[in-house]
């Protein structure tokens, strides 16, 4: 079973939870889609590992 990853959008009021997605690859795809359709900064958070990736309309940054 895939782990669940939460996608957040960065807002001036702090992080806004968008959705929970099963599987890291699917979460990255969904985050990229969100960044293209609703520009802004997004990040993926894992309960186990914390923030693992950030996405803007321009690029994806993987967090080691």
Regions found by a protein language model. Name each.
Residues 10-12, 24, 47:
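Generic structural motif
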Residues 1-16:
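Short aromatic-glycine-(Arg/Gly/Cys) micro-motifs in beta-strand/loop hairpins
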Residues 36-64:
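Short, mixed-charge low-complexity intrinsically disordered segments
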Residues 1-3, 35-38:
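Short, surface-exposed loop and linker segments with low hydrophobicity and enrichment for Pro/Ser/Thr
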Residues 15-26:
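A short, exposed loop/beta-hairpin motif centered on an aromatic-Gly-Thr core
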């Amino acid at each position: 079973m895939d782990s669940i990853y939460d996608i957040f959008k960065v807002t001036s009021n702090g992080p806004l939870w968008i959705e929970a997605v099963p599987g890291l690859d699917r979460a990255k795809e969904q985050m990229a889609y969100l960044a293209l359709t609703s520009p802004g900064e997004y990040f993926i958070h894992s309960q186990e590992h914390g923030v693992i990736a950030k996405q803007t309309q321009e690029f994806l940054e993987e967090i080691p």
